């Protein structure tokens, strides 16, 4: 018997209408996340301004690493989703659904179809911090001298019914009824879905998004030898566990530790004055009631500890939603954009800060702030 019911969550951070990555190459029934991988990784490599063959001529094959994957795996019908649904739907399981569903498959695609890489390959699965874990592998490989080049990325395409069912059952997403209550709308009025994600304001849940983000890292010597365009530098990625917790999904003490280490490391490079006067935070900013209180408290405490007053805080998820594994990549991309253009993006989906948000030492940006590229010495961004 067919069953049809209306989903109470009707907003998501989707690819632009009409953009179909599967039409840009021979997709051959690839899951959507792998289609995004091919497009995003190709874009990153071709945006170097340097032919990849020129890079390969200078770097031994075993000194190139690729760290890419997803957190949830490929769960649509061409991946694990079809593997689990086929018999129920009266169809046959294909030979591709099992292997293409694995979480490490984005990295395998980059190696096999784009780079022909013979060097290190792998991914960490770490939920919303997956991009950061992969980035940490790359940074440490380059710092140790074992690698000179690293391609880092994550891909997530979680916009399908079963995923929404899971997150909705957790009360994690901004649903229509809750959005109507926030805006005092009648039952027959449609919420403003573009304002569904409201970090640090009165909010109700996050907005699920799909995305792929890839970056290419060189060591210093190779960067100068090739004359590469330098968008930024990564000195370290800090990760800490949360200790004992009552709920596995709640934040913990590890967030304070990792953020404090990141700020201290930034101060060691740019100096105390630059940290206090010319740094900002690209926050996790999911748009959930729990996040607005816990993350704001962390940032407020860290700012006070390091003598920072009115620390500017942005939240890129107010634009693109929460892309799970790729969310930290979204934050990094936004940060590099601020470096390049001297503009800190405001949180334009909000017009006030919630009463339970810690505001001491913080300046939540509710409008774009143009400060000039030369005025940004450091960015410490957090992912909780």
List where the protein language model places each region.
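ACP-dependent fatty acid/polyketide chain-elongation machinery
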Residues: 1-23, 221-233, 333-348
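Active-site-proximal gating segment of KS-fold condensing enzymes and close homologs
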Residues: 2-6, 32, 70-123, 163-164, ...
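Conserved small-residue
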Residues: 41, 66, 131, 138, ...
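Acyl-CoA/ACP chain-elongation machinery
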Residues: 146-199, 203-204, 237-251, 285-292, ...
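Condensing-enzyme catalytic core mediating Claisen C-C bond formation in acyl metabolism
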Residues: 178-274, 279-280, 384
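Residue-level detector of conserved catalytic or cofactor/ligand-binding positions
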Residues: 379, 383
């Amino acid at each position: 018997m067919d069953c049809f019911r209306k989903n109470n969550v009707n907003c998501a951070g989707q690819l632009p209408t009409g953009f179909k990555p599967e039409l840009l190459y021979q997709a051959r029934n690839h899951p959507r996340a792998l289609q995004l991988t091919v497009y995003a990784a190709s874009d990153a490599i071709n945006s170097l301004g340097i032919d990849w063959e020129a890079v390969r001529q200078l770097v031994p094959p075993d000194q190139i690493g690729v760290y890419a994957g997803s957190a949830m795996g490929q769960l649509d019908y061409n991946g694990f989703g079809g593997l689990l649904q086929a018999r129920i739907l009266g169809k046959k399981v294909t030979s591709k659904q099992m292997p293409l569903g694995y979480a490490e498959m984005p990295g395998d695609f980059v190696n096999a179809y784009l780079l022909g890489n013979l060097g290190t390959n792998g991914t960490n699965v770490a939920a919303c911090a997956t991009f950061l874990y992969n980035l940490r592998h790359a940074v440490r490989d380059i710092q140790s001298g074992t690698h000179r080049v690293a391609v880092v990325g994550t891909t997530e395409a979680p916009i399908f019914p079963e995923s929404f069912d899971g997150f909705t059952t957790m009360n994690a997403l901004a649903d229509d009824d809750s959005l109507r209550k926030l805006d005092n709308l009648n039952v027959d009025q449609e919420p403003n879905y573009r304002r569904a994600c409201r970090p640090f304001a009165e909010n109700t849940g996050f907005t699920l998004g799909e995305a792929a983000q890839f970056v290419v890292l060189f060591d210093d010597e190779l960067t100068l030898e090739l004359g590469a365009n330098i968008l930024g530098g990564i000195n370290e990625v800090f990760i800490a566990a949360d200790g004992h917790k009552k709920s596995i999904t709640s934040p913990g003490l590890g967030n304070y530790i990792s953020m404090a280490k990141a700020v201290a490391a930034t101060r060691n490079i740019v100096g105390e004055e630059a940290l206090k006067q010319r740094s900002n935070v690209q926050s996790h900013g999911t748009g959930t009631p729990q996040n607005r209180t816990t993350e704001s408290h962390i940032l407020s405490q860290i700012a006070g500890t390091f003598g920072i007053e009115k620390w500017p805080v942005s939240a890129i998820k107010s634009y693109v939603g929460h892309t799970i594994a790729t969310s930290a990549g979204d934050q990094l991309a936004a940060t590099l954009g601020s470096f390049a253009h001297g503009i800190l993006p405001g949180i334009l989906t909000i017009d006030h800060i919630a009463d339970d948000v810690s505001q001491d030492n913080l300046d939540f940006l509710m409008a774009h702030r143009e400060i000039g590229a030369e005025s940004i010495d450091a960015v410490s961004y957090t992912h909780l």
